[in-house]
Amino acid sequence: MSEPLKPRIDFDGPLQAEKIPPLKGARAFDTLEADNFAPARLVTGEEEEGAAEAVVESVLRPKRSLWRRMVSAGLAIFGVSVVAQGVQWTANAWQTQDWIALGGCVAGALIVGAGVGSLATEWRRLWRLRQRAHERDEARDMLHSHAVGKAKAFCEKLAQQAGLDQSHPALQRWYAAIHETQSDREVVSLYAQLVQPVLDAQARREISRSAAESTLMIAVSPLALVDMAFIAWRNLRLINRIATLYGIELGYYSRLRLFRLVLLNIAFAGASELVREVGMDWMSQDLAARLSARAAQGIGAGLLTARLGIKAMELCRPLPWIADDKPRLGDFRRELIGQLKETLQKSKTRPEK
């Protein structure tokens, strides 16, 4: 059976010829240009965030000006003068047998000694926090090194700082997996796979618990002032526990420095991740229409607490993130939403009973 003939199609105008794009002329490289040629390097999002964070840190870091040096020198001279005057008063009180003045000099010396000891302790703790950043840079260099012999002692020092005993199962597995012929990169990678996840899991549990408490507190409490005080207290406590977990003892100034670094990182480097992780998921699931305003505020506060905990982990952790071991905000988000839904369902079923 033959198919029917199709009707003829008439075009209004003539067919246009296909346009051939003009070709660029060939470029010949000489020997010098060919040797120095390098492809353009692609800049990733993490590198852009790191560059922006470095710029902000350099802007906020106080510069050592001449006036600051003059003030420091004046304070040093004043301190030496006070000590010299105290020694002279003590000698005069001893010679004249003025026991009341001598007792005052001894009490002042004890107070000054306690203050100097406190400042020395704070400086040591602040130095320990800065040293952790150097250890992280050293570990990053070892992860790209093929040398042999330095990584084992370095990892043993990290385990000792974290309070892990030599008989710990994770350390025993690490000792069984390494041998003398392995490079520093392989030894540090094994430590990051076998030992470091033990501490990271504990830090994750601390972050999950603090984020859940912040979420439920905001969702239930009707007082905004109480909410703010509770969240601030829980966030400071979370930073302290994470720092202690990774073997860092925080003092007053070191705690302020760590809190400043965490907030700086969240404000300038974490905005894009927060929008990407939270905004798209909320738009897709339409949670704003399902939950009340207080519940939505609770989830937001819990996510900010989780974000703060993740950045505290990153600053206190002795090793850089490798592959996909960095905790994601989406994991904590799903936990918070599930816990909040369970709490709301329980609160609705109680009046019915």
Swiss-Prot record:
Show the stretches that span the lipid bilayer.
Answer: 70-90, 99-119, 213-233
- What keywords is this UniProt entry annotated with? Cell inner membrane, Cell membrane, Membrane, Transmembrane, Transmembrane helix
Q: How does the record classify its membrane topology?
A: Multi-pass membrane protein
Q: Does Iron count among this protein's keywords?
A: no
- Pfam families cross-referenced by the UniProt entry: DUF697
Tell whether Magnesium is among the UniProt keywords: no
Task: Indicate where this protein resides in the cell.
Answer: Cell inner membrane
Q: Which NCBIfam families match?
A: hyp_HI0043
In which family does this protein belong, per the annotation? Belongs to the UPF0283 family.
The name this protein goes by in its record: UPF0283 membrane protein KPN78578_12740
Write down the species.
Answer: Klebsiella pneumoniae subsp. pneumoniae (strain ATCC 700721 / MGH 78578)
